[in-house]
Amino acid sequence: MARRAGGARMFGSLLLFALLAAGVAPLSWDLPEPRSRASKIRVHSRGNLWATGHFMGKKSLEPSSPSPLGTAPHTSLRDQRLQLSHDLLGILLLKKALGVSLSRPAPQIQYRRLLVQILQK
């Protein structure tokens, strides 16, 4: 009887080896993952879009930084005048370097005449 049990065991292991070698029996079990509430959400490619842009631009809750141009909102009137006079001096020096006359005004372009000519065509 011991011989039959040993033969059956050997036959069973040989059969299992043959099945594994043939690729019929999988080497690892693919168990289904546990379902959570998040897996029940359905995604529609063109479905409900009511909240699409709701969070656009809201990346953090930190207070906003000062203005991007570097000018603080509490600039005094004296500082503004100094900045404007500095900018005006730079513009005048640039015009002089380019050879633009400072005494006569810039020529006025007759947009009305040009517009009438275009509309008449």
Curated annotation (Swiss-Prot):
It is found in: Secreted; Cell projection, Neuron projection. Induction: Up-regulated in response to infection with influenza A virus. Residues 1-24 form the signal peptide. The keyword Signal applies. Its main location: secreted. Residues 60-121 form a propeptide. The modification Methionine amide is found at M56. Keywords: Amidation, Cell projection, Cleavage on pair of basic residues, Immunity, Innate immunity, Secreted, Signal. One of its GO terms (biological process) is Leydig cell proliferation. It holds the Pfam family Bombesin. It comes from the Eukaryota. One of its GO terms (cellular component) is extracellular region. The keyword Ligase does not apply. One of its GO terms (molecular function) is neuromedin B receptor binding. Stimulates smooth muscle contraction. Induces sighing by acting directly on the pre-Botzinger complex, a cluster of several thousand neurons in the ventrolateral medulla responsible for inspiration during respiratory activity. Contributes to the induction of sneezing following exposure to chemical irritants or allergens which causes release of NMB by nasal sensory neurons and activation of NMBR-expressing neurons in the sneeze-evoking region of the brainstem. These in turn activate neurons of the caudal ventral respiratory group, giving rise to the sneezing response. Belongs to the bombesin/neuromedin-B/ranatensin family. This is Neuromedin-B. It comes from Homo sapiens (Human).
